């Protein structure tokens, strides 16, 4: 079952979660849930704590967790542990995951198209003491009557994400982990393949969305689809982990 939440419903949920979080803090429940989360993030109580962090990058950073399925988080963390903190990472779409990756990698490049959120992320990265590890690339989108690279989102028919997608080319080199969790995801995934290290992985979030299926399957990579609960959401989603085929 795929659950879709429109902007209005999502707004109501976020507002309600913030109100309940404030009440939970006053009565001491939030502190108890914090302790449960620290013991086991994916437990029922741990997941309940994350529901209060919806669309709150500071709270997600506090919880030290990205916004992917728990199974995908474990898969990426295993790869980062194998590389013993030396991983080179490229990320499409910044957020709490940028800090999470920065704390576990040697070098992170994250591209962000939204100027306002890029400013928020610069503050967050400085507070996390990650300015030396994470480089945030702010790349504005272009308006065009005939965009070359579309996002597929409603209301963005004249928005061109070509520069955003090609940011990885400007950085260059091979990456151990590539995260595709921003806009124009199919184009980003395909652009990242030539820059993927032989044992590297691509994390493609929200892979349950129909508009992503053809691009994922056409990447030429092995695809592991991980369905499950996601921090801060009351319903499950899917995150795909892509890797090179054996002998490929």
Model-derived features: where do they sit?
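Membrane-proximal basic amphipathic "stem/tether" segments
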Residues: 1-64
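Short, basic, glycine/proline-bearing loop/turn elements
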Residues: 57-62, 82, 174-178
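Short, charged/polar micro-motifs that form catalytic or ligand-binding hotspots
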Residues: 62, 66, 87, 91, ...
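Conserved phosphate-coordination/catalytic loops
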Residues: 63-71, 155-159, 182-183, 233-236
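Short, well-ordered alpha-helical scaffold segments within catalytic/effector domains
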Residues: 66-77, 95, 162-165, 186-189
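SAM cofactor-binding core of SAM-dependent methyltransferases
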Residues: 70-145
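Internal catalytic-core helix/loop-beta-alpha segment
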Residues: 136-191
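C-terminal substrate-binding/active-site "lid" region of AdoMet-derived donor-dependent transferases
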Residues: 168-172, 177, 182-248
